Amino acid sequence: MSAVALEKEPLRIPSSQDFAAFVTRSEVEDLLYHEAELLDTWHLHDWLALFTEDCSYFVPSTDLPRTASADDSLFYIADDAVRLRERVIRLMKKTAHAEYPRSRTRHLVSNIRILAANAEEIQVASAFVTYRMKLGNSDAYVGSTHYRLRRIDGQLRIVEKRCFLDLEALRPHGRVSIIL
């Protein structure tokens, strides 16, 4: 039996040059690092200003496929702009018992990749680890985030943030009371 050689087109990895007309890698990195800093310092109103008026923020449950929709699946978080604003207002109040006193957090962002870009939107993915420290306990949330970004008045803004947790369950955490 003779071996048949299959000739395949080599896999092409997207380059920053592919998207240079629309966005630079450093612009995207600066936005994501700035977002992490705002969350760690609890400047949530400033963080909210990074989003568009038609934004959404999703954290699907860990057993769902990445293509799942909040319309027909149970998500830990499925916020539109109104709910996201309400979440920020609630978290900043002393009556947000799960976060009073506030947790200390450290958002680490890495492996930032521009997946696609055109004149309207930019699709970005990154890996994250968010550490939450409170009352002598420490939790780690690990996963990846997919963003849809849009340039508005020359600035990149978040249209959609979708956090995929790599945890098999939220135990021992039990809940997501911080913003990932």
Curated annotation (Swiss-Prot):
Species of origin: Pseudomonas putida
Function statement: Component of the p-cumate 2,3-dioxygenase multicomponent enzyme system which catalyzes the incorporation of both atoms of molecular oxygen into p-cumate to form cis-2,3-dihydroxy-2,3-dihydro-p-cumate. The beta subunit seems to have a structural role in the holoenzyme. Also able to catalyze the cis-dihydroxylation of indole-2-carboxylate and indole-3-carboxylate.
GO biological process annotation, one example: 3-phenylpropionate catabolic process
InterPro entries the UniProt entry points to: NTF2-like_dom_sf, Rng_hydr_dOase-bsu
PANTHER family in the cross-refs: 3-PHENYLPROPIONATE_CINNAMIC ACID DIOXYGENASE SUBUNIT BETA, BLR3401 PROTEIN
Annotated GO MF terms: dioxygenase activity
Keyword line: Aromatic hydrocarbons catabolism, Dioxygenase, Oxidoreductase
Induction behaviour: Induced by p-cumate and repressed by CymR.
Family per similarity comment: Belongs to the bacterial ring-hydroxylating dioxygenase beta subunit family.
Gene coding for it: cmtAc
SUPFAM superfamilies, alphabetized: NTF2-like
Pathway listed: Aromatic compound metabolism; p-cumate degradation; acetaldehyde and pyruvate from p-cumate
Subunit structure: The p-cumate 2,3-dioxygenase multicomponent enzyme system is composed of an electron transfer component and a dioxygenase component (iron sulfur protein (ISP)). The electron transfer component is composed of a ferredoxin reductase (CmtAa) and a ferredoxin (CmtAd), and the dioxygenase component is formed of a large alpha subunit (CmtAb) and a small beta subunit (CmtAc).
Residues forming coiled coils: none
The name this protein goes by in its record: p-cumate 2,3-dioxygenase system, small oxygenase component
Keyword Oxidoreductase: yes
Pfam families for this protein: Ring_hydroxyl_B
Presence of the UniProt keyword Oxidoreductase in the record: yes
Top-rank taxon, per record: Bacteria
